[in-house]
Amino acid sequence: MSFDPVHGLSIKELNAVFFSTFLITNMQTQKSNVFVNGKVLSLHQLTGQSAHDALAEMKRLSLDDHKKTRLPGPNPVSIEKKDLAKLRSGYVISPKTDGTRYILMFTRLYNYKVVIIVDRALNVYLLPLQIVPRNLYQGTIFDGELTVAKSGAPTFVLFDAVVIAGVTVSHLTMGDRVIAIRRSLRSFRTHEKDPAVLSMKDWAPIESANVKARLKVSEDMYHTDGYVMVNVNKPVTYGRDFDFFKVKPHDKHTVDFIVMDAVGTLGLFDPNVRQNVPITKYDTTKSMFLIGTIVECSFKNYTWVPLQMRSDKTEANDVLTYQRTLVNIEEHITLDDILNSIKA
């Protein structure tokens, strides 16, 4: 195969083609389809030692000393009425994007620059962005969500940052982390060959007079399923964060169960016994899932109904999450409840 810059490819694009080809042929990868909001992205998934090394690099960059490998970021809890008073001090709010949570990592692997995304099941994919600021490859981890904008464009929405260009920022306030993200991406440019567009999540001070207008701008751009609220004064927490809240519409509450047997038993993780325990059953005449599959279910007519398989997860929600979801369904907190609590 020969390339000629005169016939449509610049030297930079030639280098990008060569680099992408080199990575695919020198790393352990397999072609994989990633499903996002009904759209299919064709990416290369790292396998074997290559995936292991990428995850080890993520753990190293994030300074995470947890015994297990996990995504370096917080997991929100569903807000309850008893939590509303917390929102009066230092919180921002944004629509909850309906997509799949990923870590976006820029680093060097085997001495070559790579852009990688990692989901909660620790699946690792190459995301070949074309025009990236060079210093990001010194080691950068962004937290975000892969979604499809209402325009139809696959989009990676950036929430937060752990480390940028080799400098740890997870200990900073959220405002400083957002400033650092924006500065690091000033020379980033979207390219027509990028598999996804990068976008910044808009966090609005929850007490601001125009908060509803700002929320609507994001809701007009993306498919959303509720709201998330973050304390701006806290550093990044790895794992469950009891000061990071989410709220969903009454008909959007879901729980991720694990299929425990062939007769439809659905279970959750019970930390007291350190294993999955049966909770409910689903109707196997309407759908069937393999044992061990994580299935997202919604609560309809007093029963849990499967919505979709969660290929991005390998573990069920725990019993605490389930119990709090039942409280959420009963309390039925709305956006107006949240905003009115700030004025109280």
Please describe what each predicted stretch is.
Residues 108-149:
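Conserved loop->alpha-helix
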Residues 3, 7-18, 23-32, 38-47, ...:
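Nucleic-acid 5′ end/cap handling module spanning
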Residues 135, 163, 175-179, 245-250, ...:
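Short, low-complexity, polar/charged sequence segments that are solvent-exposed and flexible
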Residues 144-145, 157-159, 164-166, 170-192, ...:
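Eukaryotic endomembrane system proteins
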